């Protein structure tokens, strides 16, 4: 399995380890998902960005 660069959310350090060597917190993969022009989940990502899924922008406009 190939290794991807990881980032610590607490101290913002980049590493290849599962745990941050500086502060010991869990790290996450810092590489964004691959872009595809045929994106099956595009609709849901756009709705989430606009707040329509969570009910924040449910059509009650003034």
From Swiss-Prot:
GO terms for cellular component: ribonucleoprotein complex. It holds the Pfam family Nop10p. GO terms for biological process: pseudouridine synthesis; rRNA processing. InterPro entries: H/ACA_rnp_Nop10, H/ACA_rnp_Nop10_sf, Nop10_arc-typ. The keyword Ribonucleoprotein applies. Gene3D superfamilies: H/ACA ribonucleoprotein complex, subunit Nop10. Keywords: Ribonucleoprotein, Ribosome biogenesis, rRNA processing. One of its GO terms (molecular function) is snoRNA binding. Involved in ribosome biogenesis; more specifically in 18S rRNA pseudouridylation and in cleavage of pre-rRNA. Belongs to the NOP10 family. This is Ribosome biogenesis protein Nop10. It comes from Thermoplasma acidophilum (strain ATCC 25905 / DSM 1728 / JCM 9062 / NBRC 15155 / AMRC-C165). The lineage of its organism: Archaea, Methanobacteriati, Thermoplasmatota, Thermoplasmata, Thermoplasmatales.
């Amino acid at each position: 399995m190939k290794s991807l660069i990881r980032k610590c959310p607490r101290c913002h350090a980049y590493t290849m380890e599962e745990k941050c060597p500086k502060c010991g917190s869990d790290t996450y993969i810092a590489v964004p998902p691959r872009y595809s022009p045929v994106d099956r989940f595009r609709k849901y990502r756009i709705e989430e960005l606009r707040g329509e899924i969570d009910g924040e922008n449910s059509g009650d406009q003034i």
